């Protein structure tokens, strides 16, 4: 399908955004993530196309998925763009890990996590499906190593107790095996997939927020918030960062749904930069 001559996004200028919901502009007065290295575990980064977006990276994928790392701009590029918008001074590392075979994907993720440890990354983020119990064992062991080295993880649908588990502005979903730690706005306006949107327009359903609905983006947004904090307090450990983000969050109601811990990143940064007694 050819792209339509115009893309219309109703109420685009008056919608709540990450910046209004989570007080990002106020946080930017203190930090934009400078000096923090964030790795994204994903696919289709357009690594050779968007060279200015990435500080580095590595491709651990096999076959056709491996080819998508370099020239195809899709999910990984989307997540990187979202992260860059939240923490524009952070260094972004593209780590190609996706496969339609879960075992191969976890193999790639384990390699990527080891690479992140060796290259002194500060944060790792993942935005895809939950894992089966048999593959969780290998992944948990790898994440344990990362956490022990001070690397913060923000993985959706991943209930490891050391992981910062984000979710949407709403109640716990069926894909989470424990109560999420943080609530994040789940509408992302940075990227729209044109064919999908054109399909919605053709069927008369392209209205409201629908083309921007994104649980995926809650993970890189959370990673961006961690980067803002780590930039001003690089000594903070993963457990401390989780505690700070949770303790400074607030209860909200959005679209009629209650969220117990909506991130207020400005409050979080103020809490770690106020003069110590």
Q: What do these predicted regions represent?
A:
Residues 1-7, 15-25, 123-125, 231-277:
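C-terminal subdomain of the subtilisin-like protease fold in secreted/lumenal serine endopeptidases
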Residues 2-91, 111, 118-123, 176-183, ...:
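Active-site core segment of subtilase-fold serine proteases
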Residues 42, 148-151, 156-235, 239:
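Extracellular S/T/G-rich loop segment that most often corresponds to the catalytic His/Ser-adjacent loop
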Residues 45, 128-129, 196:
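Short glycine-/small-residue-rich Rossmann-like dinucleotide-binding loops
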Residues 61-64, 83, 96-98, 157, ...:
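Residues at the C-termini of beta-strands that transition into short coil/loop
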Residues 78, 97-169, 209-220:
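Substrate-binding/access-modulating region of protease and related hydrolase catalytic domains
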Residues 83-102, 236-252:
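Short helix-loop-beta-strand segments that form the rim/entrance of peptidase-like active sites
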Residues 84-88, 114-122, 129, 144-151, ...:
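Sec-exported extracytoplasmic/periplasmic mature domains
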